Amino acid sequence: MFPKVDNPLGHQETRTGATRSQRPQAPKATAASSDELSEESWPSSSWTPSPASTTEGQSTSPPCNLIDNEDSIVAKYINRFRQAQPTSREDRQPAGPTSADFWWLQPTADSSGHLAAGAGEPTGRSAVTGPSPTGVSSTSLASAPLQKVKQSLNSWNSSLLDLETLSLQSRAARLLKRSKASLNDASSSSFPISSDGLSPSSVTFNPDSNKSSNPKEPVLGAPGPSQAIPAPRPASSQATLKPEDDILYQWRQRRKLEQSLQGAGDGTWVLPRMPALTTQTPPVSAVNLGSQDTQPNCTAPCGSVAQPPPSQAFYMERPPLSGPSPHIWAPGTHGVLWAPQANPWVSFGMLPTTLLTSTLAPLASFPVPPTSTSTTPAPTPTPQVCIPGPPTSAPPPCASTPASTLPLPDTPQGPAIPELSSSIQPKKVGPKPRRVSTSSHQKTTVPDTTAFEGPCSQLRGALSQVVTARLFPDSPEDTPPSEADFRKVQAIPSQAKVLRPPPESRRGSKTESRKSQVTLPADAGDPQPATAPKASTLLEVQPREFKMSAPRMGAGDPLTIVPPASSHAPSEDLLSQATKLLQAAEDSDGSEFQEDPVLQLLRAQRAELRQQKRWMPSYLSSWTTLKTRDLRLL
């Protein structure tokens, strides 16, 4: 704000009652001081109308200032609106301020603002840093430029303009010009260039300024076309920052490190300083169930966590937690909780600490639901709380998962290794896992773990099996089994002592292979029941095929939960009840809500997809045959 002048010097005004007050005349410039500018900045009279009999004369009383230093901008504009003399738009438009009308934009002869020969504008800060009159200390301002400025200010009513706004605009224009000059040639001046009022991103330097260049070579975008650009000096301190002192460089490095850590592993959680929980035998550390034509593989032994070769492998490792409980990682369609990438890895919760001290530690394999292949179950203990491929809800913390109770490295592992190796034998998947394996591998003894399971774990296991069976059928085609398969399925139950459930639970031969690989407790002598398929039409085969897939110990009825009195009876009862419920639900699928347009559309799409899926293997086989014949001809 410019200080107000209470005592004017020789201002004469003409006041009439009919017209508004006229604008005062500007005083003569006597010296290059800031007081005269401040005199010109504000009205020097009270601006009050006088009677008609008042004649010309000098005001003898001190004027009354209408605007104080504490008044707001709105008050200034109100006073200007009340007291300003109205002018036309043509008079106001060409009278706008320009850079040549302000003395602080003129090049000075000061020693601190000298330029090279022919320079048209200063690139360095002069001693006069702003339009504030209190900071004017230079004696190089002549009276002629000051009078010129005063005359130009008087021509467009300087007292009616907000000089503070004009000064800020001019200062911004000056800084923009200097920033352009600093961008073109950062080291043309012999003193550092100030960048007050500019953002850090706008003050950049030429990276080639440190290199030697021709002094006579013109620089593009220089302020003047005929300027002589001196030889470049070493750049300022901002251009020669070391990497350890550059904040932006450090921030970029940290960001790159964070991105590399987040993207490393492609979904696997790699712990560099935490050893993996594995045993001494490599086949026990991790089992890869794979697809139809793969054999069980194992990951790297303890000490390193390798990338999973397919998406149907699971491994165990120690999480970054304080407790000794390991996490079990198994295949699924969800993302990893600690690394949110779209990959089929699902965490199965933590094991209770009490189970880690057991001497018998069977390694449970979880069903692997690939995109279009069959689920391959394997021996599982009773309290299996798992989340197969479909997007079901995660198990609540009430159910512990003793599916894999590998002892810690400090516990003796002698009796656990033979048990683990024996339980892995029936996990081998042949070229056609849908067929039933030999009866020698069907009976595998596992310890009685029903003491660790509860009703919620049984119910959760049954629900997960139901969703898996309905969403992920066994075979890629929905064709009925052949006659040879029918005889084979009839011969297998007599060898494996299979009990037949009620006749309404009809299943396919693919479900038969899953049930033959289910493990039973040691005291149970007969495996799970199985029946031969009894489908009549092609469309009815597919619903019957996956009524019950992968029945295991711990499967339960959603309505009735039988307490685990023994290791065999609850599972058989629950499986039979679940079979009845699934059969009833499948039978009522087409009869309920027949008028619902959404269900009608979905059922039509399901029938079409089943038909396409049924004919797809024949298309693939014919295409393969044609391609093979063409290759032979070539």
From Swiss-Prot:
Subcellular location field: Cytoplasm, Cytoskeleton, Microtubule organizing center, Centrosome
Biased composition (Polar residues): 15-24, 203-215, 436-448
Phosphoserine: modified positions: 588
Compositionally biased residues, Basic and acidic residues: 503-515
UniProt keyword annotations, A-Z: Cytoplasm, Cytoskeleton, Phosphoprotein
Ranges of biased composition (kind: Low complexity): 40-56, 128-140, 185-202, 368-377
Region feature (Disordered): 1-69, 81-142, 185-242, 368-455, 472-534
InterPro entries membership: PROSER3 (IPR037646)
One GO CC term, this protein: cytoplasm
Chain intervals with Pro residues compositional bias: 378-399
Top-level division of the source organism's lineage: Eukaryota
Protein name: Proline and serine-rich protein 3
